[in-house]
């Protein structure tokens, strides 16, 4: 565990992300829960703790600073909009990535992790209870049945951009943002989006220890 903590702290430094010791401990406890549950429920194909740290925790931690910047920009652009109590929906959350990581790092954000697989939702709820994360909730539902409103709707390896935005559009708040984590150049998926969805930024990420392309596709509803 000591080696994992050192690797985590090194990754946080590379990401220029400052967290409290308590939050770092929560991230490591969360990683331990993933390891424990995966032995029985196969939450993730990644089994080695060091690989979990890189492929899951650090990969998800890479979105924290971009998310904070976008929310700060939203406050500046729409000062009459309440951004003090942000609700975020993590679609197809699986083992809680990136939703649980966001809940730990951003306690001011209420995070709902939705999945259609009951055992994965049960895991999210167990994480919330064990780590005492009052801002984290697991929802066993289809995303298209949710109405929100959510200021941010995110996904990581859930579906194509077109399907992601179509299925979750009813849950997006006015002036809300879609955050889609992608592992490759999303040009083809962007081209397939309807006119009602506008991509306003493709943000390339560097994940410490991960030699692979990562990016965030930021979208909002278009006036068209």
From Swiss-Prot:
Q: Which InterPro entries match?
A: rRNA_ssu_MeTfrase_G, SAM-dependent_MTases_sf
What is any Pfam family matched here?
GidB
| Documented EC number(s) | 2.1.1.170
Where does this protein reside within or beyond the cell?
Cytoplasm
Q: Which reaction does it catalyse?
A: guanosine(527) in 16S rRNA + S-adenosyl-L-methionine = N(7)-methylguanosine(527) in 16S rRNA + S-adenosyl-L-homocysteine
Its chief place of residence is cytoplasm
- According to the UniProt entry, the coiled-coil residues are none
Q: Which family does it belong to?
A: Belongs to the methyltransferase superfamily. RNA methyltransferase RsmG family.
What name appears for this protein in its UniProt entry? Ribosomal RNA small subunit methyltransferase G
